[in-house]
Each structure stands twice: as structure tokens, then as C-alpha cells.
Amino acid sequence: LSALGAVVVKSLSPDPWAGNPSPRVHPVAAGMLNSVGLQNPGIDAWLDEELPALAATGARVVVSIWGQTAGDYGRVAKAIARASASANANANARGSANANASARASGSASGSASGRARAGASDPTTQTGRVPAAPPAPPARSIVAVEANVSCPNVEDRRRMFAHSCAATAAAIGEAAEALAGTGLPLWAKLSPNVTDLTEVAAAALAAGADGLTLINTLMGLALDPATGRPRLGGGGGGLSGPALHPVAVRAVFECRAALPDAAIVGVGGISTGEDAAELLAAGADAVQVGTATFADPRAPARILAELERWCGHNGITRLADLIGRAHE
């Protein structure tokens, strides 16, 4: 984990959500379809019950959030903001306590030394001050960013995906951005490729307060059992991910970088090798995420990072900055 930038958790909603019926995953050529349905315990339960174990590993955490209304994004973000503020307050209090303990320890040691000097001999019973070990940092201190997954049905717009509308995307991102104001946590908008012009939606997200873009979410797909005519997934259709999605992700990143040259972009989609990662970086991504590859290989992110380093060495690249956006030179 120390070699990775962060771990992105599954998307969290204001309240617990059961998700879709099984089967939820189906393999397809060069990837898979999934229809998990955003199952999660709800933001409060996750903060209390699951984040501590994740933080204990030393992981830096990106919290993915979703909602059924624009206001839901604000509710989840507010819970994160409260946890972050509480964690920072506790950290500041610990820092003050440790500073005071250090001062007391210093004073006690000096006083004891002076007493021994006056006595002309050391006193084995003299107590020197010790600084108590600092307690572990609050789990919420491990949160480094929030990612708003807007590829979700909007119940206020006939269940149309937020990410399929500039206005709906802006509304959801605006709610989250307002809730996170003052926390110092960057907000990323994770967008869908299932639109006519992704750059327009990306621009709307940035204008509404997103600090960066995560490109892209899955493509909508469907797998049928021809013998029965029934969908192979319990929820009907699903999202296509894996290597089959990679060229779509490269194009999305390339087009958004060209249209929005100052945007921070995280590229995701079908990365399974170091060269895949290099391709998204060359298209204009500032960083990348690895998802589906971890199903078959939980160590894929570390392996891909090592492969990327070797690829850069073989191609004479000494700084990733020289690779990022190379396709636009």
C-alpha cells in the first residue's frame, strides 16, 4: 500500500443500500459485466465500522460517494466533512498534549539533574519525565479525496443518470463541493462514457466545483442466455469494464485533456499492464486507477506500477511529467 497513491472504496450513499440481485458479475470477452447495484452499508456505518480497519493498514483513502438525488451527494459529503473536521481537531489536540508532555519531561529531567548536581551524586530514585506514546491517528485522517460517482439514476429526473446531463451533474457536484468547502479534501467527478459529448459534462462538473475528473466509468452492456432469452445478470444490464473498455477510456481522457487543458484528470478503464497505464498518461491523465484487473490479481496495482517504471526506463523517460500529455505535443 505504501507504494500506491491511494485506495478508492466502493461508492457510499447516505443510507444502507442492498444493491441488485445475483448474479452480479458475468465474464465476457476481454472484460466483464457487473451489476452490483452500488451495495454499501451507508456512509455513517462505513465511517464507524469499516474505515478504521482500512486506515490501520496505512492506506490513503479516496471515498467514492453516490446518491439518488443531488441532495444525497451533499448529505454523504457532509458526513465526510464532519468526520474530517473531528479527526483534525483530535490530531491538533494530540499535538498540543504531546508538546506539553515533552515540555514537562524536559523540565523534570533538568530538575533532577540539578538536584543530583547539588547532592554531588546521582539519585537512583529520581524520576525522569517520559513522553507518552502518541495514540493512533483518527481513521478519518486517512481520507485524502472524495470521488463523486455521478453514473447513478436520478430519481428526480425519471431515473436518468446524473452523468448523462450537464445540469444534473452540476447539481450533484455543487452539493458535494459546498459540503466539503473548508475541509481541504479535493473533489473528483467520476463521469460516464455513455454520452454524446463527454467534454461538455466534464466542463459542467468543473464549473460546479469539482477539483478534478475521473475518466471513465463503465460502458452500458447486456449479456443474454440465448437458450432462455434471459439476461445473465440479476439486474438485467450491467457495466462493461476490463481491457475492452481501455480504448474508450484513452479517447475520453484525450478529448477532455484537449478541451480542458488545465483540468486534473485521473484515468481509469481497462488497465492491466504498465504500458496500458503509460497510454492513459500519454493521453493526458495525471494519475491512473486500476480496478477490474484486481479481480484476477489482487496485487495488480503494484505489478503495474513496477511495469510502468520498467517501461519508462526502456523508453528513456526519467520523469512521469515528461510522459503525461505527450499525445498533445
Describe each region flagged by the PLM.
Residues V7-V9, V61-V63, A87-A89, V146-A148, ...:
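Hydrophobic faces of well-ordered beta-strands that scaffold small-molecule active sites
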Residues V9-P14, V150-C152, L215-G221, G270-I271, ...:
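Glycine-rich phosphate-binding active-site loops on the catalytic face of alpha/beta enzymes
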Residues Y73-R82, T196-A208, A258, I271-V288:
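Catalytic cores of alpha/beta
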Residues M32, P153-A167, V201-A263:
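Glycine/Thr-rich beta-alpha phosphate-binding loop at enzyme active sites
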Residues S64-G67, L191-D197, H246, A263-E275:
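Glycine-rich beta-to-alpha transition loops that act as phosphate-gripper elements at the mouths
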